[in-house]
């Protein structure tokens, strides 16, 4: 039985998000021996973490436009290849000083910024509407799976080898992914040589997206209330998520006198504490996606399903923070 091509698109996009996050969170653990070796202050560590987002916010803003214009396959593929090369180069830049690290982190952010706009552009053309919520949920689970893998494997590599090998090995994974992405994925379903006529018909009927997006003025976009609401929700979500991703390992490792838990990097408890949140995140992401699609199939209003599940996630997170 032939696997539908759109499922391969979902799997490869999941891997792209997975690689995006292992390359993003590896420094959250690697920074511990790096700070000790290079003598960086806590303020410098914070700047290193933040510099990534200077590049990220720029290409994330234009990533959707680029993907719609040149194809999601092209933008995501070359974005991932570039950030993988920047990951491999990170140790070399670290040995050339603090500002060199900031520079390579900005470049890494520039590469990673196109990830989410690109695969969303792909899904608008590849994924039938009734499958879209769970497809997005599965792909987004790459965030948590990548975080779990990144934290765990970074800790193991540092313990048995060195922090430099974290960046070398993770970067090479992206290069390998790029090879398979180029060979097996296309930006549009009708371009794929192995797609069946039945699958192509299903996609055309259930995901009727034009290859050329409609033009919309910036003023109209910025004054659109649903757009504003989604932007605020995304800001609040990402504020908590990225602080958590960046600082959780350091918080667990830092001495009690400095407000941390004082648990050593080579401790099993350290590994357990950094993994628990992401493991539960994987479960809730996938379950939430399937639940949403199930409710929509039962004729619940799409907007109500989105609002309820989003509110459960936000209020649940706020509750446990208190």
Task: Give a label for each model feature.
Residues 27-28, 223-286:
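Extracytoplasmic gate region of multi-pass secondary transporters
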Residues 92-104, 162:
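Helix-loop junctions at membrane interfaces in 12-TM secondary transporters
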Residues 104-144:
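Cytoplasmic helix-loop-helix junction between adjacent transmembrane helices
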Residues 139, 143-192:
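Helix-loop-helix hairpin linking two adjacent transmembrane segments in secondary transporters
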